[in-house]
Curated annotation (Swiss-Prot):
Entry keyword annotation includes Lipid metabolism: no
Top-level taxon: Eukaryota
Localisation: Secreted
Main location: secreted
Biased composition (Low complexity): 172-264
UniProt name for this protein: Glycine and tyrosine-rich protein
GO CC field: extracellular region
Signal sequence coordinates: 1-18
Tissue expression profile of the protein: Component of the acid-insoluble and acid-soluble organic matrix of calcified layers of the shell (at protein level).
Stretches the record annotates as Disordered: 157-280
Keywords on record: Secreted, Signal
Length: 296
C-alpha cells in the first residue's frame, strides 16, 4: 500500500515538498492555510488505516477512500483560494511601487498553487484507483495483493485487473480442423492427426506384399510358354518323316521354316530343347544321319 500511494504522489511531491516553510508561515493570513505541505505520511496513514479497518470489505473501503479524496479536494480548493488572494495583493503591491513585497507575494502565491495542484492530482489518482476498485470489485483481493507485492501505478494496476483476451487455438499443431479423425485413403489434414494406419489411398490393399504378379499365372497366353514343347532350337529332322503326331506347341510360335521330315521316324516326346550345336558337331551329325538314312 505504501508503494502504491508513494507512486501516486511522487510526481507532485518533489515540487511541493521543496517549498520553503518560511514562505508558508509568513504573515498575510498564510497561517490560516490548513497544513504547510503535502504530507505524504498523512496520505499513507489514512490509506493504511482504511485498509486495516475494512480489509476486503470493498464497500466500506471504497467509502473510506472516497472520504480521503473529498478531503484532499477540499484542501486543494483552500490552497487555490489562498493563492488567488496572494495574487491580488501582489498586484496591489506592484501598483504601489513596492516591488519587494510584490515579489514576495508572488512567490507565496506560486507555492500555494503548487500545493493545490499537488493535492488535486493526488485526489485524481486516488479517484482513478477507486474507479478501478468499483469496476473490478470481484477482484478486490487481487488489487490489494498487487499493492502489497510492490506493483505501482494505476496503469500497471489496470493492466493486471483487465480481463485477459481469450487466446485462440494455434493455427498449426493444435486440434485438427475437421473431426480429428484421419482421412481414410487421403492425405492427412493440415495440423491434425496424420492418416497413418488408415487404408492406402490407391488400390485398396497394397500391391507390394500382397499376391505377387511375378511367379503367378501369366497375364497373357494362358499357360506359360516356358516349359512347354519348344518350337525352335531343336534340330530339324531333315529327310525324315514329317513331325506329325507330336505334342502341339501350345502358346508358342508356330514352327515355320523347318524342313519336312521324310522317311524318318516321328519325333515323339521331345521334352526339352537342345542346345544349338556347334558347326563341327553339325557336320558330324549330318554325316551320321546320312549313314543311317543310307542303311535304311
Amino acid at each position: 500500500m505504501k508503494v502504491l500511494v508513494t507512486a501516486l504522489i511522487i510526481s507532485f511531491s518533489t515540487a511541493v515538498l521543496t517549498v520553503p516553510v518560511s514562505i508558508i508561515t509568513a504573515p498575510l493570513s498564510v497561517e490560516t492555510i490548513p497544513g504547510s505541505s503535502l504530507d505524504s505520511t498523512k496520505v499513507l496513514g489514512k490509506l493504511e488505516a482504511a485498509y486495516a479497518q475494512y480489509g476486503a470489505d470493498s464497500t466500506s473501503f471504497k467509502n473510506s477512500l472516497q472520504n480521503i479524496i473529498n478531503a484532499y479536494m477540499s484542501i486543494a480548493a483552500d490552497y487555490e483560494a489562498q493563492a488567488g488572494i496572494l495574487e491580488v495583493r501582489a498586484d496591489i503591491a506592484e501598483a504601489a511601487k513596492n516591488d519587494v513585497l510584490a515579489t514576495e507575494l508572488e512567490i507565496k502565491g506560486d507555492a500555494l498553487e503548487a500545493l493545490a495542484e499537488g493535492y488535486t492530482k493526488t485526489a485524481e489518482m486516488l479517484q482513478e484507483f477507486l474507479k478501478l476498485i468499483s469496476e473490478h470489485e470481484h477482484k478486490l483481493s487481487v488489487v490489494f495483493r498487487e499493492v502489497k507485492s510492490g506493483m505501482i501505478g494505476t496503469a500497471a494496476m489496470e493492466s493486471r485487473l483487465r480481463p485477459q483476451a481469450t487466446s485462440s487455438l494455434p493455427a498449426t499443431g493444435g486440434q485438427p480442423s475437421t473431426g480429428g479423425k484421419p482421412t481414410t485413403g487421403g492425405q492427412p489434414t493440415t495440423g491434425g492427426q496424420p492418416s497413418t494406419g488408415g487404408q492406402p489411398s490407391t488400390g485398396g490393399q497394397p500391391t507390394t506384399g500382397g499376391q505377387s504378379i511375378t511367379g503367378g499365372q501369366p497375364t497373357t497366353g494362358g499357360q506359360p510358354t516356358t516349359g512347354g514343347l519348344p518350337t525352335t532350337g531343336g534340330q530339324p529332322s531333315t529327310g525324315g518323316q514329317p513331325t506329325t503326331g507330336g505334342q502341339p506347341t501350345t502358346g508358342g510360335q508356330p514352327s515355320t521354316g523347318g524342313q519336312p521330315s521324310t522317311g524318318g521316324h516321328q519325333q515323339l516326346g521331345v521334352n526339352q530343347p537342345e542346345e544349338t550345336p556347334a558347326p563341327n558337331r553339325q557336320l558330324k551329325m549330318f554325316r551320321h544321319y546320312s549313314k543311317v538314312c543310307w542303311q535304311i
